[in-house]
Amino acid sequence: MNIGDVIVFTSPGAVATVCGDTVPDLVKRVVALPGDTIASIGNRIYVNDQLLKEEWTHNEPLGRPIPTTVVPKGDYYVLGDNHPNSCDSRYWGFVPRSAIIGKVFVRYWPLSRIGWL
């Protein structure tokens, strides 16, 4: 996995409790890899002391604050591209490698944005 990859993974058990969603699989973008340092300051997210690209940050505090944390070996930190409405690692934490089904390689919706990722 690489930063920016869009992945499909088995929904963590906390999703139903925290987000009220019972879908079996989720699709999110990888923003931090094992060994990366992640933190939130105000309403911005930093990975290895670098502010994430604007489209990956949120405009108001969502989820839980992230103290400076190193992503554990074998885990990934993911965010949804529709960040203001996404239940993602900000709410339920890291995604273990064992839960990842694969990488998304094509977008087919909306039709105006169809193409390879």
What feature does the model see in each segment?
Residues 1-117:
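Soluble "head" domains of membrane/secretory-pathway proteins
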